Amino acid sequence: MGKQVEIFTDGSCLGNPGPGGYGVLLRYQQHEKTLSEGFYHTTNNRMELMAAIIGLETLTRPCKIVLTTDSQYVRQGITQWIHNWKKRGWRKADKSPVSNVDLWQRLDQAISRHNIDWQWVKGHAGHDENERCDELARAAANSPTETDTGYLENRD
C-alpha cells in the first residue's frame, strides 16, 4: 500500500436541517492541507459523511490511512452497518431505506482502493485536529455556497 496519510474530519449544521459545512485536514509527513465547503440546506450527518468522502476522494493514489472522526454515525456505519445494508439492497433491518444512501454509496466507493483505520474521538474535547476541522466546518456552514442536491432529492 502507498503513502501513509492521516485524515481528520468534522461536519457542522446550524439547525439540522439548516446551513451546514464540512472541514477536513489531510496530513502526509510534514505536509498539511485543509478543505471545507458550505451548503445552504443539509443535515449534520450528511456533512460528517461529506467530510470523510471529500478527504478520501482528494487522494490521487491508494494510501494507508488513519481517518479520525467525531461521528459514531460515520464510523459505525462504514465499519459495521454498511455490510448488511448492501446485502439488503440498501435497506435497514426493518426494511426501511437507509438514510443518506447517496453519500453512503459514494463513501463505499471512496474507500475501495485504500487501507483505512477508522478512529473516533470525542468532539469538543480538546483534540487539536478535530477542533481545527470543527472551526473549518462551522465557518463553511456560516458562508454556504453549494446546494446539497442529495438532501433535497431524498427528503421525505
Swiss-Prot record:
Record: residues binding Mg(2+) 2: 10, 134
Catalytic activity annotation: Endonucleolytic cleavage to 5'-phosphomonoester
UniProt record, GO biological process: DNA replication, removal of RNA primer
PROSITE patterns in the cross-refs: RNASE_H_1
InterPro entries: RNase_H, RNaseH-like_sf, RNaseH_domain, RNaseH_sf, RNaseHI
Domain RNase H type-1 positions: 1-142
Gene3D superfamilies membership: Ribonuclease H-like superfamily/Ribonuclease H
GO annotations of cellular component type: cytoplasm
Family under the similarity heading: Belongs to the RNase H family.
Protein's job: Endonuclease that specifically degrades the RNA of RNA-DNA hybrids.
Name the UniProt record assigns to this protein: Ribonuclease H
Protein species of origin: Photorhabdus laumondii subsp. laumondii (strain DSM 15139 / CIP 105565 / TT01) (Photorhabdus luminescens subsp. laumondii)
